[in-house]
Amino acid sequence: MVTIRLRRMGKTKQPSYRLVVADSRAPRDGKFIEIVGHYNPVRQPKELHVKADRVRYWLSVGAQPSETVVRLLKQVGVLDADGKPTPTATTPVEG
């Protein structure tokens, strides 16, 4: 199974995290498929950047976000209050 989770980076006592798509069996800081954002809780205000289109893609193909990632994605607006992806505006395609 593929998960969207945090990967710890940074120095000792100064953590920063990358939001990565990884196989659920891989170690926390091990091999990953794609980086979809980063989160720095040390800076004030806390810094969070997410590639929303890539996160929506991975959710659409069945990736499971961790509990912490769900909370962060709700803050950014990628997920709604129920934890489901927010709908995106689509444009009609001319045939």
UniProtKB/Swiss-Prot annotation:
Gene3D superfamilies xrefs: 3.30.1320.10
Keyword Ribonucleoprotein recorded: yes
GO cellular component terms attached to this protein's record: cytoplasm; small ribosomal subunit
Single GO molecular function: structural constituent of ribosome
Keywords of this entry: Ribonucleoprotein, Ribosomal protein
Stored HAMAP family: Ribosomal_bS16 (MF_00385)
UniProt protein name: Small ribosomal subunit protein bS16
